[in-house]
Structures are given as C-alpha cells and as structure tokens.
C-alpha cells in the first residue's frame, strides 16, 4: 500500500554519541538535522510534515532502528493536526526496533483531532530485555464551529510492545464521541484532554510506580499509573489543558531520565 510519507532511521553509537548511520525519507515526511540537547550523547531528530496537517486518507510510516548502546529521541516539529476525513481515516504507523542497551524516547507534540476527523495510530516496538523505551502522547480536541467539545469522529491509538520476542504490552485506546458515555465515568470523566506515558525498562519496580503515582496527584488533573509486564508502566492523565498535561508527562520523563541515565529534563527548544 502506498503512503503519503515514509521515514526510516537507523541509529548507532559512534564514540561518545549516537548518530544516524542510515536514513531515508519519501513524500510528506522529513527530518531536520540531528541535535544533541545535553551532554549525554543522545541524538534528537525532529520529524516534519511540510503540509502542516493530515488530510482525508493520508497514511504515514515511520521506522526506527536503534542499535546496541545507542540512544535517540524522536519528536515532531509541531502538533499533529487531523482535519476532516469524509471517506477514509488518517493512518500513522510507527515501528521501532531496540537492540541490547538501546534507548528510544518518542516525544511527539499533541494530536489535535478536528471536527469530522478519524485517526488511527499504531505503534509496534520490538526490544531487547536490556533496552529502554519511553513514549508520551497527548490528545486534544480541535476547535469546532458549533463550539462542541468533541467534534472528531474517532481516534484509535494502539501500542504493542514485544520484549525479547514476547508480547509484553498491548494498549488499545479508542475514543468515539458519537457513542454515549464518552465524557462520563470510565472514559474522559468530564475532561476534554487525555495524556499517556509508557515506559519499559528492566529497572521498573513497584516502588517506582508508586513514586510516579505521587507525581500525578495534582489539582485539576485525574491521573493514575499501572505496572505492566516487561517490566513496564503506563500512566494516564485526564485534564483540560494541553500545556499542563504535557508538562506532567515530561515530569515523569524527567524522573526516569535522571534516575536511569543521569540526564536532564528534555528541552526540545521548539518555541
């Protein structure tokens, strides 16, 4: 099946820093030149969609391979804006492979789903038991002409993570505003925005999960965290402000980056 845009990156360790030893892009996806945001040698790549938004039937494929001991952050230049999709949903597929000791952080800007939008996102991660994977997502409803809170049709986000060839996590998020009860108990519970943070690392234990749960205890936000096989964890937060939820997810990232790698808080320098 043809795609609107494709991106492939292969990251390896070269001395005291990580570099791309192979990269390819086609269509409506690009990457800026690599940046090194701190003194750890971790490489950061910014994915760019020159079109500025995702339209009816668009499909995108991103593949990232992180080789032994290498470390990378993949982010976006700006929010992922999903416009009206009258015939076919927008698809975003991400596939990642992590070798022994590899680190990958997926830190995109928020997904904004506008009125009439349908969006399907799948992420497949295959990782060595000694690797580290972290990702965050923030979903924001776009403005609707009639002022409705949820104008989009459907958002589906599915993440599957395999550790050492074994399926460790399947996280399937499905939001359909047209179905009764989406704003109620067990769904968004009166809030408009949703954030999620996923981490898999052999060092995750019950004490760390408890510590992250305490980070989520903030006014105006409903948050919780659960331990998953891997070992790993998934944190969710409901709120009404993109900036606040993103900062909260980055608080979790900061704790883990400092604890595991002695690395500072991510400063993606976009604005």
UniProtKB/Swiss-Prot annotation:
Localization (cell): Cytoplasm
GO annotations of cellular component type: cytoplasm
Domain of life: Bacteria
GO molecular function list: nickel cation binding
Keywords: Chaperone, Cytoplasm, Nickel insertion
Subunit organization: UreD, UreF and UreG form a complex that acts as a GTP-hydrolysis-dependent molecular chaperone, activating the urease apoprotein by helping to assemble the nickel containing metallocenter of UreC. The UreE protein probably delivers the nickel.
Family: Belongs to the UreD family.
Function, as annotated: Required for maturation of urease via the functional incorporation of the urease nickel metallocenter.
UniProt name for this protein: Urease accessory protein UreD
């Amino acid at each position: 099946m043809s795609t609107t845009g494709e991106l492939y990156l292969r990251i390896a360790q070269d001395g005291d820093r990580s570099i791309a030893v192979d990269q390819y892009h086609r269509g409506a996806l690009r990457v800026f030149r690599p940046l090194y945001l701190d003194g750890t040698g971790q490489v950061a790549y910014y994915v760019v969609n020159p079109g500025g938004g995702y339209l009816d039937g668009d499909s995108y494929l991103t593949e990232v391979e992180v080789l032994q001991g290498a470390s990378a952050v993949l982010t976006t230049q700006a929010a992922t804006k999903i416009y009206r999709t009258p015939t076919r949903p927008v698809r975003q597929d991400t596939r990642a492979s992590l070798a022994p000791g590899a680190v990958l952080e997926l830190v995109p800007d928020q997904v904004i789903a506008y009125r009439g939008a349908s969006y399907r996102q799948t992420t497949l991660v295959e990782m060595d038991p000694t690797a580290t994977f972290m990702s965050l997502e923030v979903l924001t409803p776009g403005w609707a002409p009639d002022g409705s809170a949820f104008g989009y049709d459907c958002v589906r986000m599915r993440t599957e993570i395999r550790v050492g060839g074994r399926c460790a996590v399947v996280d399937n998020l499905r939001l359909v505003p047209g179905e009764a009860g989406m704003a109620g108990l067990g769904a968004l519970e009166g809030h408009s925005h949703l954030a999620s943070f996923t981490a898999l690392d052999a060092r995750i234990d019950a004490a760390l999960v408890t510590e992250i749960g305490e980070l989520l205890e903030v006014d105006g936000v409903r948050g919780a965290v659960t331990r998953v096989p891997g070992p790993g964890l998934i944190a969710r937060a409901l709120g009404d402000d993109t900036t606040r939820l993103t900062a909260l997810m980055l608080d979790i990232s900061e704790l883990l980056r400092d604890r595991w790698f002695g690395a500072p808080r991510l400063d993606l320098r976009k604005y």
